Amino acid sequence: MSLDRALPPPTAITLVTAPGCHFCEDAHKTLTELTHRDPSLALQLVEAATPLGTALISEHRPAMNPLVLVDGRYFSAGRLPRRKLEALLARRESVAAGGVRNG
């Protein structure tokens, strides 16, 4: 009997950036560091001017750049809220490990 369980798919983090955006640069640096530390995270970088970037901006209508999505859902716009992101990822990790989801 094998104790191996199928690993859940990685958590997809999409970062939609614009040129000259210092919040975008900061978010990119932070998210790159996070994905290097945690292999269960996958970062997708999308330029706002690309067709995909334009579509995501049209769909989510962020007030500021960058737009950050977690598994395709709106997470934030503007300065990346690091503590909020860490809390979300910790909750997702707990649920994936079989814990109870609170909210």
Language-model-detected regions and their locations in the chain:
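Local sequence-structure signature of Cys/Sec-based thiol-disulfide redox active-site neighborhoods
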Residues: 2-37
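Non-catalytic, surface beta->alpha helical segment in thiol-disulfide oxidoreductase systems
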Residues: 69-103
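Thiol-based oxidoreductase modules, predominantly thioredoxin-like and allied folds used
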Residues: 39-53
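Generic recognition of short, well-ordered alpha-helical segments
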Residues: 25-29, 55, 80
